Design a protein with these regions (language model features):
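Iron-sulfur-associated redox domains of electron-transfer enzymes in respiratory
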Residues: 1-281
């Protein structure tokens, strides 16, 4: 909705994280809103910026309206790249970030699933709403042999081990952007606690997001987008209460080095047996 509200006319671009055919994640841009699906959905993966900053600057110099989405550190990087010049046509949007899993860990998980199901993974959906509720983080995988499986978050080794905060980059544990003072025009994230203070928005399974404007430009964009959304206003204290990463960075697991050492030498099956906190006999 924000992209559609900002990108009026015929000269615009929207940047975001896209999943590649190799199941990696990289920043790409679209110039047709009908292609927005490529940038939608969650990707719990490190997105490669590539030439996105340079492309953004070039498109702005051409007079295009641009929406650039990313993690807070990626938005900060874009602003540093662009320098002190103000770009009225640029709308920046960051997401509340929990850090990302190690690429080696993700690849090990995919290899394990491919061996288990005797086929290459064709698509990986980290949060499949068709397979379960938006807040259950149901993962779905489609294989080249046509097989399709879903794994509930609460019995998913991928999520359980990652969420132990045991594999993120060192900088994530000292993240300077885990505060209510953001570097973008708008901050987006899951509206955790929605069942408590907005129960009428909880049961449709579409998910509820929090939108926090940090600039006048951000407030203007949200007002324009409201026509396409069902909205409720909340005070900032309520939002921050349930959004941990707007208060503090993730805490480094004291066994991080041990885990990374295991990741270097163990297959995922052994990683799962040692580090999983739940019983996953059937996964």
């Amino acid at each position: 909705a924000l992209g559609k509200a900002w990108c009026t006319g015929s000269s615009y671009a929207v940047f975001g994280a896209a999943q590649t055919e190799k199941l990696t994640t990289e920043h790409r841009y679209i110039t047709d809103l009908s292609d927005l699906d490529m940038l939608r959905k969650s990707k719990y993966d490190q997105s490669r910026i590539g030439t996105a900053y340079a492309d953004c600057k070039r498109l702005l110099s051409e007079g295009r309206k641009v929406v650039f989405t990313g993690t807070p550190c990626q938005i900060s990087g874009l602003r540093a790249f662009l320098g002190d010049k103000e770009y009225p046509e640029l709308l920046t949007i960051d997401v509340i970030c929990e850090g990302v899993p190690s690429p080696k860990y993700k690849n090990s998980f995919i290899k394990y699933m491919e061996e288990k199901h005797a086929s290459s993974v064709k698509t990986l959906d980290y949060r499949d709403k068709d397979g379960g509720r938006w807040d259950y983080n149901v993962m779905s995988l489609t294989f080249e042999n046509g097989k399709h499986i879903t794994i509930d978050r609460w019995v998913n080794p991928f999520f359980d081990i990652w969420m132990q905060h045991i594999m993120s980059r060192p900088s994530c544990y000292e993240c300077r952007y885990t505060t209510s003072r953001r570097c973008s025009d708008i901050t987006l994230g899951d509206l955790w606690g929605v069942h408590i203070f907005c129960p009428e928005l909880y049961n449709d399974n579409h998910g509820s997001s929090v939108m926090i404007p940090s600039t006048e430009k951000g407030r203007t964009a949200i007002e324009l987008a409201k026509q396409q959304m069902t909205t409720r206003e909340l005070d900032m204290d309520t939002v921050v209460k349930y959004a941990n990463r707007m208060r503090d960075p993730i805490a480094m697991n004291e066994r991080r080095e041990e885990f990374l050492s295991d990741l270097d030498k163990m297959e995922f099956k052994r990683i799962k047996r040692k580090w999983m906190r739940l019983s996953l006999i059937h996964i």
